[in-house]
Design a protein with these regions (language model features):
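Conserved alpha/beta cores of soluble small-molecule-handling proteins
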Residues: 1-118
Length: 118
């Protein structure tokens, strides 16, 4: 439908978060402090450099003194679930992970290509 969407990913699964935001940036301001990465999908489900995105989250949390290790396989599963739920041909996604390990937030919006002059 083209709407900006937000989910919380916990050990219980992917749950939609109600709200209205103008952008992923505005959405991020409503979330707890943590680390984030922004990426895009290609062909609906492919993400280039996903391992690097996830490693940056792990490293950023470590540098900030997070008291638990980020389960990358768990986070990958959440991203896969959010991509499927978004059902967009191409999407821009933001994964936000607080310093606690209880949950993550995944926001999605339709990807809009940059103009040719860029």
């Amino acid at each position: 439908d083209g709407a900006l969407r937000l989910w919380t990913w916990t050990r219980d699964g992917l749950l939609p978060v109600a709200g209205h935001w103008s952008s992923l940036d505005a959405q991020s301001l409503a979330l707890p402090d943590g680390v984030y990465t922004t990426l895009r999908t290609y062909g609906g489900t492919r993400v280039v450099g996903l391992g690097s995105h996830l490693q940056r989250l792990v490293e950023s949390r470590r540098l900030l003194g997070a008291d638990c290790n980020l389960d990358v396989a768990w986070l990958r599963a959440g991203l896969k679930a959010a991509i499927a739920a978004a059902a967009l041909p191409e999407a821009r996604l933001r994964i936000t992970v607080p310093l606690s390990c209880a949950q993550a937030w995944i926001g999605a919006e339709p990807f809009v290509p940059y103009t040719a002059w860029l």
